[in-house]
Amino acid sequence: MTHAAASGIDSGPVTSPFDIEDYLRRVSGRVDGHLRRIAADQKRQRPARLAEAIEYALLGGGKRLRPALVLASCEALGGDPGDDGLALRFALALEMIHTYSLVHDDLPAMDDDDLRRGRPTVHKAYDEATAVLVGDGLQSLAFRHLLGTGDPRAAALAALLADGALRMVQGQALDIGAEGRKLTEDEVLELMAAKTGALISAAVVGGAIAATGSPRGLEPVGRKLGLAFQIADDLLDLTGDAAALGKRVGKDQAAGKATLPSLVGVDEARRRAGAACDEALAVLAPLGAPAEALRALARFVVTRKR
Amino acid sequence: MTHAAASGIDSGPVTSPFDIEDYLRRVSGRVDGHLRRIAADQKRQRPARLAEAIEYALLGGGKRLRPALVLASCEALGGDPGDDGLALRFALALEMIHTYSLVHDDLPAMDDDDLRRGRPTVHKAYDEATAVLVGDGLQSLAFRHLLGTGDPRAAALAALLADGALRMVQGQALDIGAEGRKLTEDEVLELMAAKTGALISAAVVGGAIAATGSPRGLEPVGRKLGLAFQIADDLLDLTGDAAALGKRVGKDQAAGKATLPSLVGVDEARRRAGAACDEALAVLAPLGAPAEALRALARFVVTRKR
């Protein structure tokens, strides 16, 4: 290690001293701790095999980007995303919805994947019926966790969660319907907005609602980051490293799936992801210092390698 | 037609002048109308195939017993289960959760059924991936419908719904784990309480919460009716008519599934269903005339032929 690196001088661009990797590490640690407690609580109920499979699915790693967006968005609007707060409950619920979608997405009848985050998928590690039930149960568990404290303020967030979850399913169905035929650019954008954009967007808006009771103008930030995230995901599938990603790459091409990079080219797709990120940053600029983490996450969404 | 039948003298037992078939017909008509509107709303969104499959699943008939229990329970406690009210929204949400569970239950990886209510199951009429997504989407849609109006009172009902849905999944998992091995009577009762009892129970308790903001002592009624309903279901599978039921009979025996009738005999199982019904009726007796429909439903649960 050079002296410069040790002293931190070269540790990031001058305009962004915020350590996003450290932030994400801290959020994951916290989210994983809570998910572990939720899974342990499930394991006190029967049957054990379902509870173990739920734990296996929930604690399989992952960047916990959606929870990070919820907490950072809450902070950005002056909220305190402390332990047991509404923002944290929403963050965990959103991650459970995301996790359920991965479990079902991997099923033989869907994407038929054997590997997820470097481990056997749930239907491989257990069986297909258990994987169906793990997904179903995680969706219920998400709503139960969010609503279980009896806090009436959770109603608006649960409605947002349900809406995002439904749009995600519509996106999956668009994706399945698209296999084997050529989508237009508009169709690809519609698919992206639903399949991935809906939950990313719900994360940003949900953090704002948890902090202030309203979306407070963050809807476009959610939409832009959702778009940027999915373009980055498609670029990583084309150009990324399977080991770093913990999943197969080149899947979209192999499945004949149209993505934005496949339609407009890698460079143009990269430019559009950057532009979407910049538009989100422009909306966040007036929020000043409290939005520092959210702005760093917006940049991470497009620059990430995993 | 004899004169006596035409004049209605023989149309029911003297102690129960309440026309439960007519009540159920009116509830189904109302529930079907609302579900049709919900499905039509989905069909304004894309993709069309998912929306059509959701409509196919939602409007496949069914007794609408759970919605009837919600509305009757609400009435029993002096509530007005009018159009667009909280009880009606909960009733529809509960029926959507029930419908999703049937769609997933019929999947090849689960019970592998080709027929449901006399029609091809969703994965037969469409395909397996669509059936997974229809179930997933219906669960989200249930919560969205219940919470979508922004009524904070919906939070408690959505928590109840989530809890019932999760217990139902645990019951399904217990059921799958039980195949091929002999369950004890306690295990069978546990399985029944979770797999079917949870939603039946949620229906009764949810109606009370919609009417008064609290379960108002109706939890035991929900539990007893859930037990009675499942025993009746198992008896119909053993002795019922496939045409009237719209599904295969003798399934449990063929699959080697332990049921209460298979463990204790048909007569004893029938006696226990009757006793559970009587216990529910005893709790409901002090509620008087407003609980007439709920008491008639309690009797229907054990006397039904479909």
Where in the sequence are the language-model features?
Chain A
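N-terminal amphipathic/basic leader segments beginning at the initiator methionine
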Residues: 1-39
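Mg2+-dependent prenyl diphosphate-binding active-site environment of isoprenoid biosynthetic enzymes
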Residues: 44-282, 289-302
